[in-house]
Amino acid sequence: MGDEAKIFTLSEVSEHNQAHDCWIVINGKVYNVTKFLEDHPGGDDVLLSSTGKDATDDFEDVGHSESAREMMEQYYVGEIDPTTIPKKVKYTPPKQPHYNQDKTSEFIIKLLQFLVPLAILGLAVGIRIYTKSG
């Protein structure tokens, strides 16, 4: 294996994103899968949607057979420059601000929720008594 593998940038590989010229990146290797598009069991859309990015996760998630992995070697064209692949950023949800609410307003609301219906009931009873005696 005296041959030096050609090194491609992700930008260069991304230019090959059509059905007549389709390259993908899997495990740091670049493959020209144009001739395989029609034969791919998942259809050509699967491969075309994997262009322009590191498709390793897409490839591994499907669970390809050992024969599929061996078949890939015939489409090998070089290596990807790892510095051109964007780093995967782990999503961290934004921190929720801590609200230091005044407990007094909460207490007043609960008190009013109790007193207002009680006052309405008292008013209704008072009107009833007043109209009966009058």
Swiss-Prot record:
Q: Any keyword Endoplasmic reticulum? A: yes
Q: Kindly give the membrane topology term recorded for this protein.
A: Single-pass membrane protein
Keywords, alphabetical: Electron transport, Endoplasmic reticulum, Heme, Iron, Membrane, Metal-binding, Transmembrane, Transmembrane helix, Transport
Transmembrane annotation, as ranges = 107-127
Question: Which residues are recorded as binding heme?
Answer: 40, 64
Q: Name one GO molecular function term.
A: metal ion binding
Gene Ontology BP, a term: very long-chain fatty acid biosynthetic process
Checking PROSITE patterns in the record gives: CYTOCHROME_B5_1, CYTOCHROME_B5_2
Query: Which Gene Ontology cellular component annotation is one that this UniProt entry carries?
Result: endoplasmic reticulum membrane
Could you tell me which Gene3D superfamilies the record lists for this protein? Cytochrome b5-like heme/steroid binding domain
Tell me the domain of life: Eukaryota
Note one Pfam family from the annotation. Cyt-b5
- InterPro entries, from UniProt? Cyt_B5-like_heme/steroid-bd, Cyt_B5-like_heme/steroid_sf, Cyt_B5_heme-BS, Cytochrome_b5
Q: Which residues form the Cytochrome b5 heme-binding domain?
A: 5-81
The entry's localization annotation reads: Endoplasmic reticulum membrane
Give the multimer and partner information.
Interacts with CER1, FAH1, FAH2 and BI-1.
The family classification in the record reads: Belongs to the cytochrome b5 family.
Q: What does this protein do?
A: Membrane bound hemoprotein which function as an electron carrier for several membrane bound oxygenases, including fatty acid desaturases.
Name of the protein: Cytochrome b5 isoform B
Q: What is the lineage of its organism?
A: Eukaryota, Viridiplantae, Streptophyta, Embryophyta, Tracheophyta
